[in-house]
Design a protein with these regions (language model features):
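Transmembrane-helix bundle of Major Facilitator Superfamily
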Residues: 2-156
Length: 156
């Protein structure tokens, strides 16, 4: 695995890299807050896709079950193929799932196509967020980065 590129200005203090933490925060908030975001779309799901209350409950449940059931496997894959590749794989699966949900003509495809893909993608992204921090940040910056991810989880 490639070493992270860090900048050491005069005095030996490591510069905190902002762009990577922004990407990791957005990934953490996107995956952690997914069910909350779905709750905002309830009325549209009813109006456009003809969703029933059990459909919406199932859509919420399927994401959590997929993400949780494959989380350990997603972390194991990350240790084998590398955290960056694992993160990209998870992001691609999440993007594909979001596209399926956006284009789905009914709740069946929305749930069993889109929500499954997004949950499966999250099972790769969430461990990758935590796995990338030690490769990017060191010392006090690592503590700050983990704190930012914890705050992002709390906000979502």
């Amino acid at each position: 695995m490639a070493k992270s590129k860090t900048t050491h200005p005069e005095g030996g203090v490591e510069k905190f890299l902002v762009l990577p933490i922004i990407v990791l925060i957005l990934a953490q908030m996107g995956t952690s807050g997914d069910n909350g975001a779905l709750g905002l779309a309830n009325q549209q799901l009813v109006d456009v896709l003809g969703a029933t209350t059990p459909d919406i409950q199932l859509a919420n449940m399927v994401y959590s079950l997929m993400a949780g059931a494959f989380m350990v496997a997603g972390g194991l894959v990350g240790t084998i193929i590398g955290w960056r590749t694992n993160f990209r794989l998870g992001a691609a699966l999440c993007a594909a799932g979001e596209l399926v949900m956006a284009l789905s003509p009914n709740m069946t495809i929305f749930i069993w196509g889109g929500r499954i893909l997004v949950g499966f993608g999250a099972s790769f992204m969430i461990p990758s967020v935590l796995g990338l921090i030690p490769f990017i940040y060191h010392g006090k910056n690592r503590v700050l980065a983990f704190g930012c991810i914890g705050a992002a989880s709390g906000l979502s």
